[in-house]
Regions:
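Mid-to-C-terminal alpha-helical segments outside catalytic/metal-binding sites
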Residues: 58, 85-96, 105-145
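Short, active-site-adjacent cap segments at secondary-structure transitions
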Residues: 65, 104-105
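Active-site glycine-centered loops adjacent to acidic/histidine catalytic or metal-binding residues
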Residues: 100
């Protein structure tokens, strides 16, 4: 089982409690766990604190959520890149890429969602990009079988 959670930064304390109780269960926090460029440092730190748990993964997605509704179609999301960089610095390769389809069509194209990570996140190593773009999810699913 993979626990998939579409929560907010405020839910991280509860998520960490679940991670403590069930360390064998991978927890995947969708849409960067609801991070937004307008979040307080406290909320951002609360999400980053969850990186201390080996069973908590962060879904590398939600570009339009991270920027906010008024900045949709802002590819390649330069104004939000610092949040993705900070998340990578904390979670490392324990991230999983997501397209946000079909919601992505309201803020970018599928290709742009993919290229944001592949091309514009030069702070992520090639090896970790492979993990984030598919190997991690493959490994998580194979642990279930």
């Amino acid at each position: 089982m993979i626990a998939r959670i579409a929560g907010s930064p405020k839910h991280q304390n509860s998520i960490r409690k679940v991670a403590d109780i069930f360390p064998e269960v991978p927890i995947l926090c969708h849409h960067m766990s609801g991070l937004n460029v307008n979040n307080s440092k406290e909320l951002i730190s609360n999400v980053m604190e969850s990186s201390e748990y080996n069973n908590i993964y962060l879904k590398f997605s939600g570009y339009n959520y991270v920027l906010g509704a008024n900045q949709r179609w802002n590819f390649p999301y330069d104004d939000a890149m610092w949040i993705y960089k900070e998340a990578y610095q904390n979670f490392g390769s324990r991230m999983v890429w997501g397209s946000d389809f079909p919601v992505v069509k309201f803020s970018s194209t599928y290709k742009q969602a993919l290229e944001t990570l592949r091309t514009y996140c030069d702070f992520i190593s090639k090896e970790d990009k492979k993990k984030i773009l598919g190997e991690n999810m493959y490994d998580l699913i194979n642990k279930l079988t």
